[in-house]
């Protein structure tokens, strides 16, 4: 299995990069990708930059170049949920594009034109505790 890990900022990915064995580095589309192993798992790590456009560019380059089986986005995030605190881990069950609104065209708020979905389910197929 090959896992891609993306963080928006260097501090979010530094410890992971230090943990990689037999690592190599390559730059694609101004993004530095570090490939290595943690045990028997191949890992490709990168700092995308802040924002969904940078994250999308990084994710696409990672998928096309390294054929990762899954991509995990790690790092700092905000929340409106009172139950979550600092250093808590949150896993989404679905994602939504919160800043897109084509309701003036008759669409529901949040609708992603083309795939005609508001909520996109997340797969937990590869997730397991070690």
Question: Can you say where each PLM-predicted feature lies in the sequence?
Answer:
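Conserved small/polar residues in nucleotide/adenosyl-binding loops
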Residues: 125-130
């Amino acid at each position: 299995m090959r896992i891609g890990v993306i963080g928006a900022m260097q501090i979010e990915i530094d410890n992971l990069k230090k943990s990689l064995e037999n690592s190599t580095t390559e730059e694609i589309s101004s993004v530095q990708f570090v490939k290595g192993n943690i045990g028997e798992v191949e890992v490709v790590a990168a700092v995308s930059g802040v924002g969904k456009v940078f994250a999308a560019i990084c994710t696409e380059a990672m998928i096309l170049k390294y054929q990762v089986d899954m991509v995990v986005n790690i790092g700092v995030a905000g929340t409106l949920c009172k139950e979550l605190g600092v250093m808590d881990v949150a896993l989404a069950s679905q994602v939504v594009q919160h800043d897109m609104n084509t309701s003036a065209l008759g669409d529901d708020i949040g609708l992603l034109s083309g795939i005609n979905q508001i909520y996109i389910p997340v797969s937990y197929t590869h997730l397991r505790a070690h």
